[in-house]
UniProtKB/Swiss-Prot annotation:
Function: Outer capsid protein involved in mRNA capping. Catalyzes the last 3 enzymatic activities for formation of the 5' cap structure on the viral plus-strand transcripts, namely the RNA guanylyltransferase, RNA-7N- and RNA-2'O-methyltransferase activities.
Coiled coil regions in record: none
Main localisation: virion
GO molecular function, one term: mRNA 5'-cap (guanine-N7-)-methyltransferase activity
Gene that encodes the chain: Segment-3
Subcellular location: Virion
Enzyme superclass (EC): transferase
Name this protein carries in UniProt: Viral guanylyltransferase VP3
Catalytic activity: a 5'-end diphospho-ribonucleoside in mRNA + GTP + H(+) = a 5'-end (5'-triphosphoguanosine)-ribonucleoside in mRNA + diphosphate; a 5'-end (5'-triphosphoguanosine)-ribonucleoside in mRNA + S-adenosyl-L-methionine = a 5'-end (N(7)-methyl 5'-triphosphoguanosine)-ribonucleoside in mRNA + S-adenosyl-L-homocysteine
Amino acid sequence: MELFSDSGSIVENFKERINKLVFDYSLNHGGFRKTYKIQRDRVYYMLGDAHHANLSGKCLMLYNSEKDIFEGLGFKVKGSRINVSKTQILRNYEINFETIIGVEPNGLKTISTAKDVKKLYDIYSYKSSLHPFDDFMAHCINRWGMSIPASLERIIKSEIIKVRSGVLNRNSELYNYIPTVDASFSEMSRGPANVILTDGKLVPDGTCFGPILSKSVEDPRLKNEFRSKGLIMVHDYFILIGESPGPHYKKYTKMTKDNTIFWDPRRTDHKFNNVVSYFKKENIRDVVEYTTDALNRGLKPLVLIDIRKDKPKNLNTPEGAIEWERMVHDDNNLIIDMVNALDKRVTVCAKLRPAFMQVGSMRKLLRPVRILPLPYLRRSTAEFNMFVPNEALMNGNEIYDVTYDDLVRMSSEVFVLKNIIGGLYNMYLKDMHLNLGVVNKSVSLSDGSSAIWSLSNINNERISNFNFNNFLYAAPYSDFATSSVKRHFKGRNYSDWCLNILDEVNLKDGVYLVPLYAIVGGGQITSHDFVNAIITDQEQLIDFTQSERALSTQVVKLVSFILKDSFTAKGLNWTEIDNEIRNRRLSSLSGVGFTVTKMLDGKVLVDGKVVTVSGHMLYILLGSILGLPYGIKKYLKEIELNILKPGSSYERGVGGRVWHGLISHYLAVDCVIDVIDEYMVCTYEDRSKLNVVLRYVKSKLLELGSKYDVYLSVDERLVL
């Protein structure tokens, strides 16, 4: 007899089948379709039918009248892309938490307009030296698990040398046939395995996980928006200098006349404290005064600077060019004077431009900075974001010494990157700027925090106590005997602590384990959502009524069908085994004080009432033990709500009585014990752990019996 966790066991076969699930449908004939008398049954069997459709190499065939309800529960038409995933639903929900542990670019974009001040934490630090190409290469390897092909790397380095030496005019368009691209990561990471320069043209060959040949999109509005997007959400006092017109600031409802000073000679319609004048050196003391007052009031100031004089009319003459360079130089020194004058607790972002002629040296910085290329910047423009982090946002990548030569050299690298692999490079720059407000250190789950797959990494201590308030935690889910899992995704290996039903039974009241497929809020489902779960006290994400807001007891048939196939693979007939175990448990009642009578039609009377073993409890509990989560605490609450307000269910259709009584549910737990003991033998240690789960479920059922008399006397003969 195989052990529970043996390779090739029924349990492992069961879990493998979960990971192969696909939830597509087609309106074309030739798909997989069963016949049902009522539409409700088609919905109830939808997950099980999807499993069988997968096995047949087809997808479900639906009629137009059926597709809306299937799409509402997460199915998508075959060949279409996922518009919103369940993971995205969780990321969107993170805006409700003050502290977010482990960030992701799309999630940061979603919460960037939050009204409150966020605390963001992630251990990953974006490298930011004076060598943009090296920084990007390091990010590709460390964050994406991606290597830039050697042939492409050589060409990029060669072009950088040409630009620096003046052989190639920076104002030209490098390889103008390369398309401008702004797409998804998946689309921009299917690049050439090899690149050859032939007759002045880059010729790609083969495909690999790497950057595609592309130019970055140029968009001044988005450039300005992303420069500050990652910082506004972690600050609550703002001074904007030279930022007109700044239409993107209207997105932030937290920025008001009371906490935002807008300093620009051009009038705007912003409802801020507008100072309509040029910013001069003597105004630095005003900014120092404003920010000091804000700090004294416990606020977190952010100063954004985009000082730029108008270009001289004679710019195209030698005299005009020198005059412009001096103007740029003066602006840079004004910015540095302000940075040096401000308190170290003040965050500053200032646009910095190199002076290409010998007009002097920039003043020495007294605070550490990061010099960052800007996303969406014109490819031929040399401009940088000088990010001066407050003390909390420093991550060890800061520098003190920056020269014009450094900026010119950096601009050559950025120019080539944006013209050859600009699509992916621009995404990297966006992500880096979104992360500017993130504190790069490890923290623990706490009240008011969210940790979506960030604390589950095996390098962290496993969380076993979820005694928190207002929190959300996401992690992989597996069978009750497994505490960690290994997964491979996009070329990278992940090892994570996983959740299981043992974690769930130790949760305090009001805290629930919920599989991703069951969270409320829409979104399409994938197999990923059936092997991952959340633990939370956020009942807004949970549906306890088995409504059509989210998947629920459709999982019963999925577990049933997968079990049948897993047992068949071992030469066993699950249907016969299931029926035999249920009948045996019903018959066993006669020896413990009950009168059991079997009727001619096969129904069983217990003390004169028809009783069956609850298939819902059996499959929900067994599935959760084997690695397909439902949320046993969630299901127990669904049972209680049904007792309080008898109504409809997917299994029984419309009606008005309690689904099952105490005996029915209690026997189902015993049936689970029989299945495990007879066909999935556990080690002594694992069997002891399983006893904890089974005792918990039985105790909760007995509590319901002591609270509600109607739960003790359910007669399943009564028509629903």
